[in-house]
């Protein structure tokens, strides 16, 4: 068990284990977005930083087929931040909130040595999509194209530059695809830690393994911060799922099926390194 899973296991209860905690039709989710851990201010504008901080949190709501309604922001700002940079941050938060019809209802601000952001999203759902629910011989698929986020991160780490529309900066969420497909999906989650690592979470939740029908390179499958959807569904619904992908203009790649076997994650955890 890696250190992240070990720590989470200390608080194990029925609400922990999904992208958010589901309680009476309400989904509560929270993620951190810290300078020098998730980003550097030389990589992105303050506006882009705020946008991404909101989007990675809204992604958790969408992954559970929930409608985000409210946000609480905690922002630790460096003491030398300027008013114009503060305005950029505020505009980034507000523009994403407006796009997804989310009301920012409060939070906290403190002075810090660097820029650290945590966001709590409160969402509602009538048909939650959870990680638990898939069965043996179900199909496994992901949306979009994965692997580019890690490549662009590598460029930034090596003092290179990336396109302004890079997936590392501009996250595309799959709310329409999830909404129209939810009735057919047996389980799902967003790809935040990388395909192989998030498959490990599905395997653990459902006590299954996977038989791959497509070869996926380790460099692509270990790419984190993709925020595409990882889903499973009955093979009898394959045509219906393809129709829904076309309807929502979403690329859907079916790459495996679930089997009764132990799954081994080939990627190293990037949360805790020794």
Regions found by a protein language model. Name each.
Residues 232-239:
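Helix N-cap motif at beta-to-alpha junctions
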Residues 151-168:
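Short, compositionally biased
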Residues 1-62, 102, 126, 138, ...:
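N-terminal glycine-rich phosphate/pyrophosphate-binding loops that anchor nucleotide-derived ligands
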Residues 46-71, 91-99, 174-176, 180, ...:
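Small-aliphatic-rich amphipathic alpha-helix that forms the alpha element of a beta-alpha
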Residues 168-172, 245-274:
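Acidic, Ser/Thr/Pro-rich beta/coil linker or hinge segments at domain junctions
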Residues 80, 168-226, 265:
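Active-site-proximal betaalpha loop/short-helix elements
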Residues 33, 69-154, 257:
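Glycine-rich anion-binding loops of enzyme active sites
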